[in-house]
């Protein structure tokens, strides 16, 4: 399985800022948006292109364009929505598919509650957006859902990932590519990433307990 930990200095600087427990909701949200753009840039570096001839200022010019159907972005509700604006800034024509799975805090297993996918998935690159790859259960369930709908080229973009989640993903879907700003140390006994970011959804939407 292809796993890319993006070591670009800007990415590492921004993920470090996100780890600050005193960071405001506004600051956290802005950094998540910026990291979404930077990580999507890395994740799309191997897209197929094709030649296209168009009018230029001095006559016809041949340029490169992305080949095939438009990319679909797949934010996992709700925290994945925080990454969506940054990725759309880079790929404004992308289609957006939305899935909702929440983790049962007792079993740590994903429970699906929403699915709205774009058509022609078999022709598209699908980029899953989720700030945290923890146990891998939610991600694996999302990939299962996408593959049942016809998706064949799937990548995941995460702010932080746990080794346990990466191992589980590789066992279930070794064909999926992973792009992350950081591979953290481990999961605690509640399935949270350490050192992690805290609850990314609460920090993005300002719903954490004071």
Curated annotation (Swiss-Prot):
Domain of life: Bacteria
Sites where the protein binds uracil: 193, 198-200
Disulfide bridge partners, by residue number: none
Positions annotated to bind 5-phospho-alpha-D-ribose 1-diphosphate: 78, 103, 130-138, 199
Top EC class, one word: transferase
GO-annotated biological processes: UMP salvage; uracil salvage
Cofactor mode of binding and number, as noted: Binds 1 Mg(2+) ion per subunit. The magnesium is bound as Mg-PRPP.
InterPro entries, A to Z: PRibTrfase_dom, PRTase-like, Upp_B, UPRTase/APRTase, Ura_phspho_trans
EC number: 2.4.2.9
Named cofactor requirement(s): Mg(2+)
Swiss-Prot/TrEMBL keywords: Allosteric enzyme, Glycosyltransferase, GTP-binding, Magnesium, Nucleotide-binding, Transferase
Pathway terms, separated by semicolons: Pyrimidine metabolism; UMP biosynthesis via salvage pathway; UMP from uracil: step 1/1
Catalytic activity from the UniProt record: UMP + diphosphate = 5-phospho-alpha-D-ribose 1-diphosphate + uracil
Function: Catalyzes the conversion of uracil and 5-phospho-alpha-D-ribose 1-diphosphate (PRPP) to UMP and diphosphate.
PANTHER family per UniProt: ADENINE PHOSPHORIBOSYLTRANSFERASE (PTHR32315), URACIL PHOSPHORIBOSYLTRANSFERASE, CHLOROPLASTIC (PTHR32315:SF4)
UniProt similarity note: Belongs to the UPRTase family.
The protein's name in its UniProt record: Uracil phosphoribosyltransferase
Organism annotation: Xanthomonas axonopodis pv. citri (strain 306)
């Amino acid at each position: 399985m292809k796993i890319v930990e993006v070591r670009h200095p800007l990415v590492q600087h921004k993920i470090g800022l996100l780890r600050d427990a005193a960071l405001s909701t506004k600051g956290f949200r802005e950094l998540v948006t910026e990291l979404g753009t930077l990580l999507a840039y890395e994740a799309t570096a191997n897209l197929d292109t094709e030649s296209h001839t168009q009018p230029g200022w001095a006559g016809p010019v041949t340029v490169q364009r992305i080949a095939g159907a438009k990319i679909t972005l797949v934010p996992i509700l709700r925290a994945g929505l925080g990454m969506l604006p940054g990725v759309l800034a880079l790929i404004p024509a992308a289609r957006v598919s939305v899935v909702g799975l929440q983790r049962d805090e007792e079993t740590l297993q994903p429970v699906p509650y929403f699915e709205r996918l774009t058509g022609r998935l078999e022709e598209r690159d699908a980029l899953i957006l989720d700030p945290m790859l923890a146990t891998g259960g939610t991600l694996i369930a999302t990939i299962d859902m996408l593959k049942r709908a016809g998706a064949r080229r799937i990548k995941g973009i995460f702010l932080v990932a746990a080794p346990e989640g990466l191992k589980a993903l590789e066992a279930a879907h070794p064909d999926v590519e992973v792009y992350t700003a950081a591979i953290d140390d481990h999961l605690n006994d509640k399935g949270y990433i350490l050192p992690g970011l805290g609850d990314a959804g609460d920090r993005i939407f300002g719903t954490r307990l004071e």
